[in-house]
From Swiss-Prot:
UniProt keyword annotation of Protein transport present: no
Top EC class for this record: hydrolase
Origin species: Bacillus velezensis (strain DSM 23117 / BGSC 10A6 / LMG 26770 / FZB42) (Bacillus amyloliquefaciens subsp. plantarum)
UvrD-like helicase C-terminal domain span: 281-586
Record text on subunit structure and interactions: Heterodimer of AddA and AddB.
Protein name as catalogued: ATP-dependent helicase/deoxyribonuclease subunit B
Protein family: Belongs to the helicase family. AddB/RexB type 1 subfamily.
Length: 1166
């Protein structure tokens, strides 16, 4: 047996020498003794391709490329040892999750931590590390029980940690014993079986690409040395370390220590040892700058390089996106102008999570093919989400979030239905479930979902044909969605063991045709040329089946709860990863600096070279701290490197990255993160600055205007990117900035392209103004018709903002409805409750003033009970919380009823109409208009309450409007058309009083009654009567009254002097009205109602003429945008010139009346 060491610095030709040696042997003896080429997992595909592409060999029978795991699989297949299946990392984590739950009561340290996310994974890593370093459960127990007399202050804590780990390690080994092999046991088994393996006997073994080995791997190598004919080890180091391991500060500490261990092993085995040192750098013979970096990077002091620097570039960028875009442009330039292929490029990242998603986005924009080395998590694959959400449904009372998470994976969809149609139906059902609060038994009881678009608390309507059709579709969708999940739920309820639960889940996947659906997704991905996605669909299904098989195999007869089953399955799916091979040869390689292995790379981009990233700070999130590891190492327990050693090894990884390309090296770093926080350059950048003092950093500018005109041409790499940058430059021009002529040329070229639709659309946005153009007459008529039938509130909405009215009444956009109790719902309940009470009084021939407190309470409770099932999809009956809300509402209605009764006792006014309709079947006719443009308009609605009183001047009428918020009548709002309801109601009542009531009436006022349950604050204790009196004052009605003493006295018969507690008016000693009374003359009322009618006409004409401008009003601090549902549609933005509020001047009531009088005089004189 012979052992040869190939030792040389990076780029010295070690791998090339091995490949050439293998190729020579294959040419010389194609069917000779086996050749084993042992490399890391990440390097197997690359080396297989390198050997296979040799044109004169034509295939390989003799030579094979292996990783340790593939070699184990091959040896054990031929020698035995495969009778017990291996358990994957996923299976181990699921088993550990179960063991943690069973034994957490025995833990000394990890009782609380065991419930945290990621704990199971950390434990699995630690136990795997024990196995790799040949530490048995008994060793862990012995370490935990060792004395605590050392100077290490954390030894007691370490002892307790090891105690807990020892329990789990021992229990895991017991669970697997005789049935399964841990995924790390394959190396131990491989070392045992190598003496029996024909593939090893007499073989030539080449080992390349490794920096260090675990004790398990060293045992395998020891057996290879003993049983192979010859073993060649290739290690990156500047010199052999045969007799002594290198100093810990040596750049090649890691590989030097590996050399020392291998040399001592070979020496103990009496192998024939030889060493071949490779000097110089073959890789960098045409790039002296790179040769300088390779040779001088770790030399201090190093001679500054003064030659040409074309092969080396440091790039600075504003942020990570600008950094990647700069690299993408550079790659395009190298391919286009430098004669390189994409496969000649490599991007190395120290922290891939910072760049991975952004890189996919940027490279897609630039049309760059790429392959990201490494295993991507399966967490976001539809199948994994389908399983997780399905179990959430059956365990979590069918919450709508879980149900629709499941549905939106599209794996629940019927196989034979058009997907787009099904998506729309699922969206509609989701909207229904959100609006109706569907959950739990509502899905499983068999009761049909009832759909009603139009519901009234006061009247019952028959279902429309449209409602019936929608209800049918909703129930059909519900049936096919719920049926398989109900079946899964029933099976899970019956299942008691892990085996039966795993079977139930598998049958669910089969029932829903998941294999066929995934295969269809795979075929579509292949047809679209997305080979990586195609691989993922197949791997996801295989991984899930293997997971269930391991689950059932290891713990099949164990009885567990559904909650623990779900928890273990969640743990298992979290550890699932895709293992992908490059789907094409000509791709940019994107790798992790510490794990990836490269060969034949011409241009390397080392990105993200920031402080704290390169070199990387050691991760201390493991189960054992760095101090724990250092102490264990001091007492002779070998584990993986502690943080201090890993930090030292970072410099070797950096060295390997910097020396990896043969032609060009780019080192880049951003100066800020996505949030604008400053990022500092790495010490690597500073070191390169020392080696190349004359080097000028290149700026990867996010915007072209930051670089010279010549450099701006580099931003025109392809049509899509050119369109984006051209649009951004022309946008600067629209803001009166100077731009290069390059962009006008680019604009002309792009607009002349045969397919220039995207460019045209993009460039048209440059001249976009956030304005809504007036609708053409045919469009306006089609939307609104020749006859408008609307409400007063609709006219108020139009006057508040024309566009908001257009969105709601023209486009008929609606907000998504939610199952919640909003202020309008409560207001509707109050209105309807008071109407029901009034109806009961009329039936029993009672007056409000006749009511006792008990009657108020009984009538109020009865009214709310009758209305609750009709309110907002029965929300008041849906939960204990809402039942409590219902009781609160009953108390408020009771309070209000009592106050109304007290008001009636002190008033000469009596209700003459409640919920009085005008238009339609109401007793009053609608308010009608013939507009100047030929259209007609009809306003309909309902008046809360009309009161009448007999006075010496005849019949008086007043309007009372119930509001759940405190408000009065602001004449400025009336003037601007924002508060038209009350005066419209008064106008209609007075105008038609003779037909309706048999005599002409005079306006007495308009009042708002605030429905609420007030709280009284007092600095001193108060008696019950005092409290009631204060509460009574809180219900004073606000509004506008007729400035007549008799009318005021009729509203409050108790008022003789001072302020009224019922209305916002008062009397002086002489009987005249106080100056602070909200009162006007009868003539003023007519002025106001005439103005309201003119406002309606103007609004109606504007609507039918197609006015839809985005001009919301602003009156003091009030604006309709505050509660507008359509802000995302109009995109109103004060920073834009064209978007300004329509500022309305706030004036006192007297000023408003003066304006109206002047306008009336002007009209009379015109």
């Amino acid at each position: 047996m012979g052992v040869e060491f190939l030792v040389g610095r990076s780029g010295s030709g070690k791998t090339r020498l091995i490949i050439d040696s293998i190729q020579d042997e294959l040419r010389r003896e194609p069917f000779g003794k086996p050749i084993i080429f042992l490399v890391p997992d990440q390097m197997t595909f690359l080396m297989e391709y390198e050997l296979a592409k040799t044109p004169d060999i034509g295939g390989m029978i003799r030579a094979q490329v292996f990783s340790f795991s593939r070699l184990a699989w091959r040896v054990l297949q031929h020698t035995g040892g495969m009778n017990r299946p291996f358990v994957t990392t996923t299976g181990v984590q699921m088993l550990l999750r179960k063991l943690i739950e069973e034994h957490k009561h025995e833990f000394k340290v990890y009782q609380k931590a065991s419930d945290k996310t990621g704990f199971t994974e950390q434990v699995e890593r630690m136990l795997t590390e024990f196995k790799r370093y040949c530490i048995e459960p008994e060793d862990v127990r012995r370490m935990a029980e060792s004395g605590t007399a050392s100077e290490y202050r954390g030894e007691r804590m370490l002892s307790e940690k090891l105690h807990d780990l020892g329990i789990l390690y021992q229990q895991m080994e017991r669970s697997l014993a005789g049935h399964y092999l841990h995924s790390e046991d394959y190396l131990t088994l491989l070392a045992q079986q190598i003496p029996l393996a024909d593939v090893v006997k007499g073989a030539h073994v080449y080992v390349d690409g490794f920096y260090q080995f675990t004790p398990q791997e060293l045992r395998v190598l020891e057996q290879l040395i003993m049983h192979a004919e010859h073993v060649t080890f290739s290690l990156t180091a500047d010199s052999p370390s045969a007799e002594q391991a290198p100093d810990e500060l040596d750049l090649f500490r890691m590989t030097g220590s590996t050399y020392y261990k291998l040399y001592q092993t070979a020496k103990e085995l009496n192998a024939d040892i030889s060493c071949k040192e490779l000097h110089g750098t073959k890789r960098h013979q045409h790039a002296p700058e790179l040769a300088c970096i390779e040779s001088q990077y770790d030399v201090r002091p190093a001679a500054a390089y003064t030659g040409g620097q074309e092969a080396f570039t440091v790039m600075q960028a504003q942020n990570r996106r600008a950094e990647l875009e700069g690299i993408a442009r550079e790659i395009q330039s190298l391919v286009r102008d430098g004669g390189y292929r994409y496969k000649d490029m490599a991007i190395l990242i120290r922290q891939p999570e910072d760049y991975k998603d952004l890189l996919k986005e940027v490279f897609a924009d630039y049309g760059l093919p790429y392959f990201i080395d490494g295993k991507a998590s399966m967490q976001h694959h539809p199948l994994i989400e389908f399983i997780r959400s399905s179990l959430d449904v059956v365990k979590g009372n069918w919450r709508y979030e879980a149900v629709f998470r499941c549905a939106k994976t599209e794996l629940l969809f019927p196989l034979d239905q058009p997907e787009q149609k099904i998506r729309e139906q699922v969206d509609q059902l989701e909207n229904y479930c959100i609006a109706y609060g569907i959950k739990g038994e509502r899905w499983t009881s068999g009761e049909r979902f009832v759909y009603r678009r139009f519901v009234s608390l006061d009247e019952d309507f028959a279902q429309t044909d449209q409602e019936i059709e929608m209800e049918h579709m909703l129930n059909e969708t519900k049936e096919w969605m719920a049926a398989p999940l109900v079946k899964l739920q029933n099976r899970m309820k019956k299942a008691k063991t892990v085996q039966s639960m795993a079977e139930a889940l598998y049958l669910f996947l089969e029932d829903t045709d998941v294999p066929l659906k995934l295969d269809r997704k795979r075929q579509r991905a292949e047809e679209a040329g997305n080979m990586i996605e195609a691989q993922q669909h197949g791997q996801a299904w295989d991984a899930v089946i293997q997971l269930l098989e391991e689950f059932a195999g290891m713990m099949g007869e164990d009885e567990i709860s559904l909650a623990l089953f779900q928890q273990m399955l969640e743990t298992g799916t979290e550890s699932l990863h895709f293992s992908l091979i490059p789907p094409a040869l000509d791709q940019v390689f994107v790798g992790n600096m510490d794990l990836s292995r490269m060969y034949g790379t011409s241009c390397t981009f080392v990105i993200g070279a920031n402080d704290g990233v390169l070199p990387a700070r050691p991760d201390e999130n493991g189960v054992l701290s760095d101090d724990d590891r250092e102490w264990l190492k001091a007492v002779g327990v070998e584990l993986s490197s502690a943080g201090r050693e890993r930090l030292l090894d970072e410099h070797f990884l950096i060295y390997m990255a910097l020396s990896s390309p043969s032609d060009r090296l780019y080192v880049s770093y951003p100066i800020a993160d996505a949030e604008g926080k400053t990022l500092l350059p790495s010490i690597v950048v500073n070191r390169l600055g020392e080696l190349f003092p004359d080097h000028q950093e290149k700026l990867s500018a996010a915007d072209p205007e930051q670089v010279s005109e010549e450099e701006q041409l580099q931003y025109l790499v392809n049509k899509q990117v050119a369109q984006t940058y051209t649009a951004s430059q022309l946008r600067l021009w629209t803001r009166e900035y100077e731009i290069s002529d390059v962009w006008w040329s680019a604009y002309n070229v792009l607009m002349k392209e045969p397919d220039h639709r995207r460019a045209k659309k993009l460039f048209s946005s440059l001249f976009f103004r956030n304005e809504a153009k007036r609708l053409e007459r045919p469009v306006s008529r089609q939307l609104y018709g020749e006859h408008i039938k609307g409400s007063v509130s609709r006219m108020e909405a139009f006057n508040a903002c024309q566009f908001s009215h257009f969105a709601s009444h023209g486009l008929q956009l609606k907000e998504r409805q939610f199952f919640k109790l909003d202020a309008p719902d409560i207001g509707q309940l109050f209105h309807s409750s008071l109407k029901l009470i009034s109806d009961r009084l009329r039936e029993q021939k009672l007056e409000w003033r006749d009511l006792t407190k008990d009657q108020c309470r009984n009538f109020s409770y009865e009214a709310v009970e009758r209305l609750a099932p009709k309110l907002q999809k029965e929300i008041l009956l849906s939960s204990n919380r809402h039942f409590y809300v219902k009781e609160k509402l009953q108390k408020i209605v009771t309070r209000v009823s009592g106050i109304l009764s007290e008001h009636a006792k002190a008033s000469g006014f009596v209700p003459v109409g409640l919920e009085l309709g005008f238009g339609g079947s109401g007793p009053l006719p609608p308010l009608t208009f013939t507009l100047k443009n030929g259209c007609t308009m009809e306003l309909v609605g309902r008046i809360d309450r009309v009161d009448k009183a007999e006075s010496s001047k005849g019949l008086l009428l007043r309007i009372v409007d119930y509001k759940s918020s405190d408000r009065g009548l602001d004449l400025a709002e009336v003037y601007y058309g924002l508060a038209l309801q009350m005066l419209t109601y008064l106008d209609l009542s007075i105008t038609h009083s003779e037909d309706w009531l048999g005599m002409k009436a005079t306006p007495a006022g308009v009042l708002y009654f605030h429905i609420h349950d007030p709280m009284i604050q007092a600095s001193l204790p108060m008696g019950l009567d005092e409290i009631e009196q204060e509460i009574f004052k809180k219900f004073k009605m606000k509004g506008l009254l007729l400035g007549d003493r008799e009318a005021i006295s009729l509203m409050d018969t108790t008022l003789e002097e001072g302020r009224s507690n019922i209305v916002n008016a008062g009397l002086k000693k002489d009987g005249s009205l106080r100056s602070d009374s909200a009162a006007v003359s009868e003539q003023d009322f007519h002025l106001l109602t005439d103005h309201v009618r003119r406002t309606f006409e103007q609004a109606g004409e504007a609507i039918t003429d197609g006015l839809v401008s985005i001009t919301p009003y602003k009156l003091k601090d009030k604006t309709p945008c505050t509660y507008c549902a359509f802000q995302s549609v109009c995109q109103f933005d004060e920073s834009l010139k064209e978007n300004e509020y329509r500022s309305l001047k706030a004036e006192k009531d007297g000023t408003i009346l003066d304006w109206l009088k002047k306008e009336a005089d002007d009209d009379a004189n015109s």
